[in-house]
């Protein structure tokens, strides 16, 4: 069994990766990426807002924990731990955190704007 404090080119440990504050009550951790796909962990405090935005990337999201009001293309749904959703390219979307929680986002292609310069 390997300790949790290790990383490699193909594996990462959340103990070694930095959290980036991206808004009030909102932070993200880029877990890994290549030229085609990116895995991102997003932590929300209750009341935090992922403001409505759009991008040309495909996005699939898994709700690890918490409760969220998610809006995609004008349609709102309440989602909780264990739920997931897909956002097609250029679809307006956003979320309001109703109970503190975490999302796992997968983007294709890579969100270059998330990478440190």
Positions of predicted regions on the chain:
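Structural motif
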Residues: 60, 67-69, 76, 92, ...
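Short acidic-glycine-tyrosine-enriched beta hairpin
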Residues: 74-89
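A short glycine-rich, His/Asp/Glu-containing loop-to-beta-strand
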Residues: 17-48, 106
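Short, conserved beta-strand element in jelly-roll/cupin
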Residues: 43-44, 54-70
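A cytosolic small-molecule/anion-sensing beta-strand core signal
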Residues: 64-65, 80, 99
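Single conserved hydrophobic/aromatic residue that forms the stacking wall/gate
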Residues: 1-10
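Ligand-binding loop in jelly-roll beta-barrel domains
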Residues: 89-113
């Amino acid at each position: 069994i390997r300790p949790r404090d290790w990383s490699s080119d193909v594996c990462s440990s959340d103990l070694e990766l930095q959290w980036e504050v991206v808004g009030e009550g909102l932070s993200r951790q880029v877990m890994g990426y290549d030229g085609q796909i990116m895995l991102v962990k997003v932590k929300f405090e209750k009341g935090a807002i992922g403001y409505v935005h759009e991008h040309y990337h495909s996005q699939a999201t898994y709700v690890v924990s918490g409760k969220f009001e998610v809006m995609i293309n004008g349609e709102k749904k309440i989602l909780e731990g264990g739920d997931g959703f897909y956002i097609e390219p250029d679809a307006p979307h956003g979320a309001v955190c109703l109970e503190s929680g975490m999302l796992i986002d997968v983007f294709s292609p890579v969100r270059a704007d998330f990478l440190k310069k």
